[in-house]
C-alpha cells in the first residue's frame, strides 16, 4: 500500500483500526471485520438466497455485520442472521480420578521430646567479632619473662644485621597474639659491633606500629640509670656503704662465701 493513503475497510467502510489485513480475494479488512470469518462470502450467499424468492432461509449464514442495515433483494425477506459466534473454552475436568482427601493430622498426647528442649523458637544470630586489645606491663612468651624496658634485637631482612630496641609496652589481641611497642636505640662510635653495650647507646625515635613477639629476640633486662650501671650485680668488695638497694640474681646465693670474703677484706 502506498505511503500517505489511508486504508478503508471494504465491509464497514471504516478508516481507523488497530490492525489491517488483506483477505484472499484482495480486499482490505479492518481488525473487527477480520474476525467474522468469511464476511464477503456470507454477504453474497445471503443476496442469492433472497433473490430465490419466497423468503427462504436455505442459505443462512452466521456472519455478523458491525454497521449498516441487512441487504435484501427481490420480494422476499431473506434476512441475515445476526447471531454472533462466541467461542468459549471449557475446561475439561476428569472427575473419574479424584484426589484423595488429606489425612487428618494426629494429635500426639505424649509429652515433648528431649530435642524440643534445645530448640529455640526465635534463633538469634551470633554477633560479629570485634577486635579487642589488652595492654600489659609484662608478658610471658616462649619461656622468657618480658617487662617494660627490656632490650630486644630485631634482624633486618636486607642486610641481616641486628638492630636493638627497648620495649615500651605490650599488646595482646583477641586471638592471644602478643606484640610489643618499641623504642629504637641508636648506636654511637663507642658501640661494639659484635655485642650490645647499654652504656654506648642512646634512646632514639619511638615506633608507632607494634611488632609481633616472634620477630623479637631477648637481649637483656632494663639497665639501671639510663643504660649505665653504677654498681656491679656480682658480689664484690663494697667501697662504700650501700643502703636501701640490694642486688640479687636468679638461683641459689652463696651467702656464707660472700660474708667470709667481705670479712677478710675488712
UniProtKB/Swiss-Prot annotation:
InterPro entries in the cross-refs: GATAD1 (IPR039050), Znf_GATA (IPR000679), Znf_NHR/GATA (IPR013088)
Compartments, record wording: Nucleus
Annotated region (Disordered), positions in chain: 59-112
One annotated Gene Ontology cellular component of this protein: nucleoplasm
Name of the featured protein: GATA zinc finger domain-containing protein 1
Role noted for this protein: Component of some chromatin complex recruited to chromatin sites methylated 'Lys-4' of histone H3 (H3K4me), with a preference for trimethylated form (H3K4me3).
Molecular function as annotated in GO: sequence-specific DNA binding; zinc ion binding
Free-text tissue specificity from the UniProt record: Expressed in the eye (lens, ciliary body, retina, sclera and conjunctiva) at postnatal day 2 and 10. Not detected anywhere at postnatal day 14.
Subunit structure, interactors included: Component of a chromatin complex, at least composed of KDM5A, GATAD1 and EMSY.
Stored SUPFAM superfamilies: Glucocorticoid receptor-like (DNA-binding domain) (SSF57716)
Cross-link type Glycyl lysine isopeptide (Lys-Gly) (interchain with G-Cter in SUMO2), residue numbers: 259
Coiled-coil spans in chain: none
This protein's UniProt keywords: Isopeptide bond, Metal-binding, Nucleus, Ubl conjugation, Zinc, Zinc-finger
Organism: Mus musculus
UniProt gene name: Gatad1
The keyword GTP-binding belongs to this UniProt entry's keyword annotation: no
GATA-type ZnF: 9-33
UniProt biased composition (Low complexity): 59-72
GO terms under biological process: chromatin remodeling; regulation of DNA-templated transcription
Amino acid at each position: 500500500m502506498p505511503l500517505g493513503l489511508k486504508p478503508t475497510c471494504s465491509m464497514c467502510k471504516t478508516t481507523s483500526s488497530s490492525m489491517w489485513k488483506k483477505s484472499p480475494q484482495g480486499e482490505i479488512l479492518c481488525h473487527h471485520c477480520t474476525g467474522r470469518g468469511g464476511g464477503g462470502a456470507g454477504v453474497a450467499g445471503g443476496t442469492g438466497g433472497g433473490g430465490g424468492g419466497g423468503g427462504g432461509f436455505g442459505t443462512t449464514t452466521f456472519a455478523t455485520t458491525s454497521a449498516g442495515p441487512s441487504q435484501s433483494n427481490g420480494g422476499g425477506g431473506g434476512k441475515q442472521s445476526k447471531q454472533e459466534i462466541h467461542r468459549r473454552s471449557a475446561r475439561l475436568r476428569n472427575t473419574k480420578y479424584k484426589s484423595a482427601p488429606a489425612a487428618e493430622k494426629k494429635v500426639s498426647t505424649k509429652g515433648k521430646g528431649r530435642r524440643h528442649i534445645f530448640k529455640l523458637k526465635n534463633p538469634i544470630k551470633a554477633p560479629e567479632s570485634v577486635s579487642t586489645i589488652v595492654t600489659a606491663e609484662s608478658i610471658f612468651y616462649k619461656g622468657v619473662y618480658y617487662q617494660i624496658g627490656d632490650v630486644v634485637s630485631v634482624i633486618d631482612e636486607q642486610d641481616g644485621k641486628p638492630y636493638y630496641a627497648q620495649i615500651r609496652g605490650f599488646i595482646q589481641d583477641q586471638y592471644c597474639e602478643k606484640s610489643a611497642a618499641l623504642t629504637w636505640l641508636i648506636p654511637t662510635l663507642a658501640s661494639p659491633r659484635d655485642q650490645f653495650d647499654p652504656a654506648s647507646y642512646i634512646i632514639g625515635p619511638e615506633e608507632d606500629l607494634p611488632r609481633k613477639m616472634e620477630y623479637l629476640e631477648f637481649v637483656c633486662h632494663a639497665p639501671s640509670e639510663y643504660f649505665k650501671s653504677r654498681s656491679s650485680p656480682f658480689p664484690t668488695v663494697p667501697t662504700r656503704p650501700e643502703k636501701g638497694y640490694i642486688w640479687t640474681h636468679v638461683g641459689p646465693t652463696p651467702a656464707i662465701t660472700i660474708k667470709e670474703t667481705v670479712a677478710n677484706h675488712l
